[in-house]
Amino acid sequence: SIRSPEGVVAGAAEVAARHVLAPPYVIKPATEGSSVGVRLVHEASNAPPLDLADWPFGDPVLVEEYIPGRELTVGVMGDRALTVTEIRHSHGFFDYDAKYTKGHAVHELPAPLPPAVFEAVLDQAVLAHRTLGCAGVSRSDFRYDDSRPGTDGLYFLEINTQPGFTPVSLVPEQAEHVGISFRELCAWLVETATCHG
């Protein structure tokens, strides 16, 4: 099974007025990607959870329990998990700048994890890809709280059905690590693409 953080969907006005979850938690726009607009609400913060004047994303708002620990990601190509990458960065989370600015994050692959956790992350990424009916390539993001025993600290955060494909993006890097060149990856995507209409 796949464990995910507790979460709610609420209106921006409701999130601005009160804590809809106990802090710490993460606020995300429902219609953005690449961590655009993501906010982290800390336990000790006395500020309103959300400033509507600084929230151009509208409704709905996704609010999720913040999971401490290590940031992991897995690319899935067809029905094959590529590898697990641990993302280390100086920001509070893997934000837009860390994702797309060279040198703002370190990608460690394969991630240094206990073997059972490593295999669980791979399996859960493939399970999410299949369960959601994804085709081609996806990338699943996880948090791993290694203070908890075994796989108890592993949480699935989200699946990206259109993961980045820049020179510093994770899926091309993982493919290269397992012996699939960027050219081969792109050719595979074109050759296996199907239209649904």
Question: What role is predicted for each listed range?
Answer:
Residues V38-V41, Y96, L109, F165:
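Short clusters of hydrophobic/aromatic residues that line enzyme substrate/ligand-binding pockets
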Residues S1, P115-G197:
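ATP-dependent carboxylate activation and anion-phosphoryl transfer catalytic cores
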Residues S1-R70:
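Active-site nucleotide/adenylate-binding loops and adjacent lid/helix of ATP-dependent enzymes
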Residues S45-D123, T151-Y155:
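Phosphate-binding site of ATP-dependent enzymes
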Residues A10, V38-A44, V76-G78, D145, ...:
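Short beta-strand-to-turn element immediately C-terminal to the catalytic PLP-Schiff-base lysine
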Residues S35, V106-E108, T166-V171:
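Short small-residue beta-strand/loop micro-motif enriched in glycine and branched aliphatics
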Residues R3, V26, L62, G75, ...:
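Conserved beta-strand segments that form the floor/walls of ligand-binding pockets within enzyme
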